[in-house]
Amino acid sequence: MKRIFTTICVIMFFTASAFSQQEEARLMRFPAIYGDQVVFSYAGDLFTVDKSGGLARQLTSAEGVEIFPRFSPDGQTIAFTGQYDGNTEVFIIPAEGGVPERITYTATLSRDNLSDRMGPNNIVMTWKDNDHVVYRSRKKSFNDFQGQLFLAPVDGGISTQIPLPTGGFCSYSPDGKKLAFNRVFREFRTWKYYSGGMADDVWIYDFDTKETVNITNNDAQDIFPMWHGDVVYFLSDRDRTMNLFSYNTATQETKKLTNYDNFDIKFPSLGDNAIIYENGGYLYYFDLATQTPTKVEVQIMKDFAASRPQWKDASKSINSAYPSPDGKRVVFGSRGDIFSVPASSGITKNLTKTSGVHERNQDWSPDGRWIAYIGDATGENEIYIMKHDGSEEPIQLTKNTGTYIFGYEWSPDSKKIAWSDQEKRLQYIDIDSKKVTEVDQSNSGELRNYEWSPDSKWLAYTKPSFEEVTRIYLYNLENKTSKPATDEW
């Protein structure tokens, strides 16, 4: 008996060790919380885990994505946006798991994708009560920027529009008589620090008086209102990084509650006693009683079938093609690699054969000896050249560019390459010496239009003025000076 007990203890020890050594999951999206239960989207499926962390349990496994889960007020049901039937619709599922039930039916949109900057259609926002799910839909809008808020009965009845012309993320007051909401929806945009006309505020709409009040009134992005008691919580980047703030509806006092300075808080949601959110790909919950954040350390056991090596037909993903000067071969860009293909007969070659590296903008040198391309093997955009047949390792020409390179142009003598970048610069490099020379830098728009002279001694380019009116300039490589070739307006 003692030996059996010892064996069991050893097995339990190694099992616990295996779980403890399981790598912590990252890139968990769109979390929700109720009590001790957390639900989130990972690799397009829904998972649930205790807020203390641990091994997550998978709730959904459909081919499409399941995103934006939200607990009902009683915590018994999860509403989410899914693609079980091809279209993006609202579904409900028991909080402990089960068969999803579809509760909305809308027409398919041309722009309905998780990666689209407009975001997907029919996103679950919140619940009004245990019988109605609030979702944002573009089904009535002619403009991809605009969407309205709708109530979907959980019994599958017809949805009704909340009486607002447009709407984004929102939250009801505890008595259900008011709604804190964003008028604009731009949470899927890819740029930061926006403060223009579409920078949003948090507004409160009174269903009785029909009045709307701006409670943030700030040039920054104030988004994701979450109403709990007398306090409306929201995100703001008024201090450059998205952090959690609160607005007390009784005292009209605004407080900053978190102090992240690296990654933004993203996609928070309100539970019964906590707010959960993404930060740097991890999950954290903010306890409303103690006003403190806690990380949820999650492990996920999944086969990750989609990440296994697969055979792909590169011909279906060609993004550019350039024939050789003699017309005998063509270089194609596809799936981040560069291919050399014979015009009539011969061998097709993958010239780069890199994994996890994006090579693009491939082109032949005018003499046909070299192929140049832009690659990010170093983590930055750099310009490379390689022998036309791929017989030698590529040569990295530029170093530490630190920005995005739009494209480049070979000089007719095949001795230099000019390029422009997101820093609004036009530069060229001497291939033999590797010396980089800056031709010009704009204070206004980008310098994307430029051409070499036939003798490779001049560069002609257009440069925008402050009013975006362009002039043509000529740059002499010998004396390194530019002069305008056209008049100012």
Residue ranges and their predicted role:
Residues 35-36, 74-76, 130-131, 175-177, ...:
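Short coil/turn segments that connect the beta-strands within blades of beta-propeller domains
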Residues 4-15:
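Sec-dependent N-terminal signal peptides
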Residues 32, 70, 126, 171, ...:
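Conserved beta-strand position repeated across blades of beta-propeller domains
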Residues 23-51:
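Mature N-terminal segment immediately following signal peptide/propeptide cleavage
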Residues 312, 317-323:
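Glycine-rich phosphate/pyrophosphate-binding loop
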Residues 18-20:
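Boundary at the C-terminal end of the N-terminal hydrophobic targeting segment
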Residues 42-47, 61-66, 79-91, 95, ...:
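A flexible loop/linker signature enriched in serine peptidases of the S9 family
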